[in-house]
């Protein structure tokens, strides 16, 4: 007889890990409320406590790095936008001069 492995979404895992301390539950209580095997929930909670987070979560350093990258991209996009605005105004004036 083969045993099917249950797959859980990242969101479900994160919510399950948050539920245990928020409701001051033991692993066994949390597992029974969520209809999970005790060992599974225990592994998720242990990983979260060790700083590994839930699967799919990122570290603070990774998030800060992404923020810096996004800020640089935003500044570049703003600069390009400003250049295009000035170019549009310039060519609009040139067009008006040529039509008079």
Swiss-Prot record:
Pfam families assigned: HTH_Tnp_1
Domain of life: Bacteria
InterPro entries tied to this protein: Homeodomain-like_sf (IPR009057), RD_transcriptional_regulator (IPR051839), Transposase_8 (IPR002514), WH-like_DNA-bd_sf (IPR036388)
Keywords noted in UniProt: Transposable element
GO biological process, one term: DNA transposition
Keyword Metal-binding part of the UniProt annotation: no
Gene3D superfamilies: Winged helix-like DNA-binding domain superfamily/Winged helix DNA-binding domain (1.10.10.10)
GO molecular function, one term: transposase activity
Family membership noted in the UniProt record: Belongs to the transposase 8 family.
Protein name: Insertion element IS600 uncharacterized 11 kDa protein
């Amino acid at each position: 007889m083969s045993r099917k492995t249950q797959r859980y979404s990242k969101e479900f895992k994160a919510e399950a890990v948050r539920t245990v301390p928020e409701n001051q539950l033991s692993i066994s209580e949390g597992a029974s409320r969520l209809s999970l095997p005790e060992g599974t929930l225990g592994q998720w909670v242990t990983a979260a406590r060790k700083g590994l987070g839930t699967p799919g979560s990122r570290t603070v350093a990774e998030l800060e790095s992404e923020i810096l990258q996004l800020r640089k991209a935003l500044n570049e996009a703003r600069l390009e936008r400003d250049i295009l605005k000035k170019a549009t105004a310039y060519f609009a004036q040139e067009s008006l001069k040529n039509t008079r």
